[in-house]
């Protein structure tokens, strides 16, 4: 009943497709699909306000609101530290459990960690979109992620990379619903080149956060 109330509240009046039956984690669910038409921002590039997002490790995301000339209008640090602490605690328990049991028995605990990671991604994506909408940003800009093929590495590293990917996907969906475009740029030379396209910057040797261009 709660799910149907949510659909009536959030998706009333939207074009609905026939529900699909799905099996997930040995349970069956109904998936409802809706179609919504929105108009994305058409503001001229020179007049645009953008929300630049840096997805980090210690801090979940740093959002910078800026104009085309590089003027910073606002900055927000998004960090769900308690959620990450719980997730990493679960990973620690998985490592200890794995030493004593088979990998098949560990799978259910690993699935739980992935669900926690996805829930964290949803929270971060919602905060990014909300902040961009507050400043009426026309575009949310992310770093382009090279994530083709199988991801290797430790479980903590895998979860972090998956979280970056999921945040971008979720944020793109939420941003489009708010009429905000999403762009991805290569991170190469972003610290070396000036934001106005004039070329390389000159860094202060004593404080690398200060530069001249």
Regions found by a protein language model. Give the residues of each.
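Positively charged, helix-rich recognition surfaces that bind polyanionic ligands
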Residues: 28-213
